[in-house]
UniProtKB/Swiss-Prot annotation:
Identification of the protein by name: Frizzy aggregation protein FrzB
Species per Swiss-Prot/TrEMBL record: Myxococcus xanthus
Function: Necessary for proper aggregation of cells to form fruiting bodies. FRZ genes define a system of signal transduction analogous to the enterobacterial chemotaxis systems.
Keywords, ordered alphabetically: Chemotaxis, Transducer
SUPFAM superfamilies in the record: CheW-like
Superkingdom per UniProt: Bacteria
GO BP, sorted A to Z: chemotaxis; signal transduction
Amino acid sequence: MDLLFFDIGATLYGTDASQVLRIDRALPEDLTLAELGLPHRGNRAIVFDTPEGEAHLKVDAVHGVRSIPVNSLRRMPPTAGAAAYAVGVCLEEARTVLLIDLVETARTQGRH
């Protein structure tokens, strides 16, 4: 699976690269989600499509797309009580990276 890795604040996240339309400059009104942490600078935005149109998630850095073997991915168990946007984790080298669904992230903010 192709994942896009990015930072919000000091935390590394990943998302399904097929959800991403492009990376752009961030605008003041772009989406931030306190639960993911607040960006230090937030100069970049991940642009993605929702049923209502394009949405933008403000991020600090984009690390690029990497193909990750399916056996390195884990779905978030329903009993974890995680937010709807937290779809799983990726076992990336020595750390675990939270994988988020961009459309669900926008819905959480009531933007789409």
